[in-house]
Design a protein with these regions (language model features):
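Conserved histidines in hydrophobic membrane contexts and catalytic metal-binding motifs
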Residues: 1-369
């Protein structure tokens, strides 16, 4: 029995080693980009283009006019949304464009910044380049490595691989987990091999549960990469726009009257019939842990309120989906939690480096023997 157990432990150790070697570089890139994206809202605001403040007494351009201007500028897209709102003079609306050129190996998102008083485009560009916003480029890289649906599938598989690496690592170091967590395992610094081994064990143990949570939620959000229907949809170019007849400002007023406590974080603007006008946002007192788990939908043809959504009152499948993004990016617990996510996001890179050092040392020792 002992021999069989040792055989299985050696096999699990080899799996752990090869998982780390094969996925180390992409997981390093995902960890680094994810650590930056934890503070994407603040960085977006800091990096966003600015315009001259408007003259005193000048009224902003109606949102409906901006919607139609952007819709004619991008005449064949799946949808658009407003994801950034001016809070002070000189700030712009940020529109997000959801295009589809029929190529499943590209992801056709773009950013458009619009002066709310002059009604002109200040900056625009696809998320495959920096003109679409440096953080938008980084988010798309984190999401799919800028490789379209193939990248979505790859990042989902990497999430599974990291989960397997966490599980096999927990088995390999199972007898030392308690000592490491209680700080009873010394950090040996008298040789680089021992230091690498101890760092690998310490970092992997302390980040184990949060790394498992992050990689599982990332896998779950990219699960559609396994769906053939999603691939087929990406092969269908977006048809020409059919913009809403009813003014955006009227729909916005209806939505706000139906859900006055909702603080908008995104306004989804249909470009084709059959898609509702929707405001997503947060409700004070219910922001944690749901993130933007509240929404109101309005029929753009009739102006009738369709749904008012509160994730904390929904059935568990809807609650589950609403939790995924906040748990993945650490947006559910304020600054201390977000800083913790930044630190843990750096650990896959450190684990990859220390793991490679240990593998290389063993390989070199075997060659000398």
């Amino acid at each position: 029995m002992g021999s069989l157990k040792n055989t299985w432990l050696r096999r699990i150790f080899r799996w752990h080693s090869w998982l780390g070697l094969l996925t180390g570089v992409p997981l390093l890139l995902l960890g680094l980009s994810g650590s930056v994206l934890v503070f994407k809202p603040e960085l977006d605001h800091w990096l966003a283009p600015r315009v001259a403040p408007p003259p005193a007494g000048r009224a902003p351009v109606p949102l409906d006019s901006l919607y139609r201007m952007v819709g004619h500028r991008y005449p064949a897209i799946k949808k658009m949304a407003i994801v950034g709102f001016p809070q002070r003079p000189g700030e712009c609306y940020e529109f997000r464009i959801y295009g589809n050129d029929g190529n499943p190996h590209t992801y056709d998102l773009a950013g458009v910044w619009v002066d709310p008083y002059a009604g002109r485009v200040v900056q625009e560009g696809a998320n495959t380049g920096l003109a679409g916003g440096a953080l938008n480029w980084l988010l798309q890289f984190h999401f799919c490595f800028q490789l379209g649906m193939g990248g979505v599938l790859l990042t989902a598989l990497l999430g599974l691989a990291l989960l397997a690496s966490v599980a096999t690592g927990a088995v390999v170091y199972r007898k030392q987990l308690g000592k490491v967590l209680l700080l009873r395992a010394p950090l040996r610094t008298h040789s680089w091999r021992l230091l690498a081994s101890d760092l690998h064990r310490y970092v992997g143990t302390w980040a184990l549960l949060l790394n498992a949570l992050i990689c599982f939620t990332g896998f779950w959000m990219n699960l559609f990469g396994f769906d053939p229907a999603a691939w087929r949809a990406q092969c269908q170019p977006a048809p020409p726009n059919q913009l809403m007849a009813r003014p955006v400002d009227a729909l916005l007023a209806t939505a706000r009257a139906a859900y006055p406590e909702l603080v908008p974080t995104r306004i989804r603007l249909p470009t084709h019939p059959g898609t509702p006008f929707e405001i997503d946002g947060v409700v004070p007192g219910h922001a944690l842990p749901w993130g933007p788990g509240a929404a109101v939908q309005v029929d753009p043809t009739t102006g009738r309120v369709l749904t008012v959504r509160r994730a904390w009152q929904a059935a568990w499948p809807a609650q589950w989906e609403a939790l995924m993004a906040p748990l993945h990016f650490g947006t559910f617990g304020g600054w201390p939690v977000r800083v913790l996510y930044v630190v843990v996001g750096l650990t896959p890179g450190l684990l990859a480096l220390t793991g490679f050092a240990l593998w290389y040392r063993r390989r070199a020792g075997a060659a000398r023997a």
